[in-house]
Amino acid sequence: MTSIDLNCDLGEGFGPWQMGNDAAMIELATSVNIACGFHAGDADIMHQTVKLAKARGVAVGAHPGFRDLHGFGRRPVPGITAAEIENLVAYQIGALQAVAALAGHKVSHVKAHGALSNVACEDDMTARAIAAAIKAVDPKLVFVVLASSKLQTAGEAAGLTLAHEVFADRAYEDDATLVSRKKPGAVLHDPIEIAERVLRMVQDGAVLSVTGKLIKLRTDTVCIHGDTAGAVEIARGLRARLAQAGITVAPFARG
């Protein structure tokens, strides 16, 4: 029987401000990626999110991004060096590891956020710096990468275990990169369309680009963004469609 992981980015509020419905999404995901205080999140939110994950038996991962609360980590940082990237990634992983220990859980994986991930998918230096930081902190951590990207290449070169990620609610360009959020149609919202699209990804390892090109993608984990409008309904519909097709959902890694 085929099995797939469903991951979600959570803990992306700050102080009293909340982003998305973490409690509902964590009931539907099998892995979660927790903001570590740079693009969103704080110590209390991190701890609360880890506790929710532990109670549900959900795998926990660090979701490091650029230090950009105002821009939610979705803006590139021109001129940043490889050493600075290594430092900020290691810092955020370590922060979540400490908070997870306090909550009686362990960090199993790392997935870069927003602009950090987008830049790394196309820039060798950024991708290698992220991989180097993960390897230095704990080489057993699974590195979640966009399939067929420079992140994948860097992770392989570093000898890390990889989980190849596809996105349920994002459109793809012909080169297998994600369509920029600045473009119309970049984010998908129809639960039925998304469920059928993901089913094809899981069963056939393929997705149609915005121009209709068939792109082959290895699929280990499917991301559903918790801040996408209707995220809970999308996740419920996806799980139901996968179950209907005889596909189980399970974490790709455990801490």
UniProtKB/Swiss-Prot annotation:
Forms a complex composed of PxpA, PxpB and PxpC. CDD domains: LamB_YcsF_like (cd10787). GO terms for biological process: carbohydrate metabolic process. It comes from Rhodopseudomonas palustris (strain BisA53). This is 5-oxoprolinase subunit A. PANTHER family: 5-OXOPROLINASE SUBUNIT A (PTHR30292:SF0), UNCHARACTERIZED PROTEIN YBGL-RELATED (PTHR30292). It comes from the Bacteria. The keyword ATP-binding applies. It holds the Pfam family LamB_YcsF. It catalyses: 5-oxo-L-proline + ATP + 2 H2O = L-glutamate + ADP + phosphate + H(+). Keywords: ATP-binding, Hydrolase, Nucleotide-binding. Its EC number is 3.5.2.9. GO terms for molecular function: 5-oxoprolinase (ATP-hydrolyzing) activity; ATP binding. It is an enzyme of class 3 (hydrolase). Catalyzes the cleavage of 5-oxoproline to form L-glutamate coupled to the hydrolysis of ATP to ADP and inorganic phosphate. Coiled coil: none annotated. Belongs to the LamB/PxpA family.
